[in-house]
Amino acid sequence: MRTAYFALMIALPAVAAPPHYLDIYNTAPSSLVSIAIAPAGTAAFHESSFAEQPVHGGGDSVTVAIDGDAGCARDLRLSFADGRVLEHKRFDVCKFRSYHTGRYWQRSGMGSTYTAQH
């Protein structure tokens, strides 16, 4: 019986975790031109460029699909048309379904790069 169970487990295909969807609301004053997302603490960023159709500041939004296999904690790197970069470490994509850029933009004092952490 144990052997049959183990053989069945080997025969089952690996099932990928469903993706997480993150609604990004650009409430910052500058247009969002790209977002890069990586599993927290890694350099394995996957970038989505919006250069052809930027996500305009003031409330425009975009929804991105995030691979569900790497867990919940993600590092985000958002690049804006004016050259500024907003980095957010350990953002929980399981707990939060939306991200509002203006909340972190206001806290940054607006140097060229700002890093937030959850």
Locate the predicted segments by residue.
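Sec-dependent N-terminal signal peptides
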Residues: 3-14
